[in-house]
Amino acid sequence: MPSFSHSIDVSKPPSEVFPWLLEQDKVPQWTSDLERYDVDGALGVGTHVTQKLTVAGGIALDMEITAYDPPRGAATAFETNGVKVVSEYIVEGSGAGSRVTQTLDAKASGFTAKMLIPIVQGRLETKLKEDLERLKTVLEG
């Protein structure tokens, strides 16, 4: 699946935006379909985050933080059903505020996974856009 991304402009500086991307008490406030979000230890490269999503009867994901550079960006990776997903956030200063870009890249390793990607790609793109717009609303609320 080709990667896709979405950007939002927020009227807050990167130092105020960045904590909302991974912190346990903040992510559930703007992420749809999220039942549980647990960070195992201090945030940083190698930290594991467990997400339980309410979609498809409930999906548990074990994500690993693979890049962590406050307040400029972070990345996570997880694998589910033969699909490896990397999500990257870039936070750039933009005037008095910030531009936040999230890029999602998924690679399938088997036939079944390759067949699933076209089915879920549209839903993932919509979710990414809606969640980032919700983040903007929460931050500027």
Annotate the PLM regions.
Residues 1-40:
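Hydrophobic ligand-binding cavity/cleft-lining segments
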Residues 1-8, 129, 133, 141:
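Hydrophobic-ligand-binding modules of eukaryotic lipid transfer/binding families
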Residues 3-5, 58-63, 84-88:
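Short, surface-exposed coil-to-beta transition loops
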Residues 7-11, 38, 52, 64, ...:
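Generic structural detector for well-ordered beta-strands
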Residues 11-15, 42, 66-71, 90-99, ...:
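A short, structured loop/turn motif at beta-sheet edges
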Residues 42-50, 68-77:
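Short, hydrophobic/aromatic-rich segments at coil-to-beta transitions
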Residues 77-130, 135:
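Beta-strand/loop substructures that line and gate deep hydrophobic ligand-binding cavities in soluble
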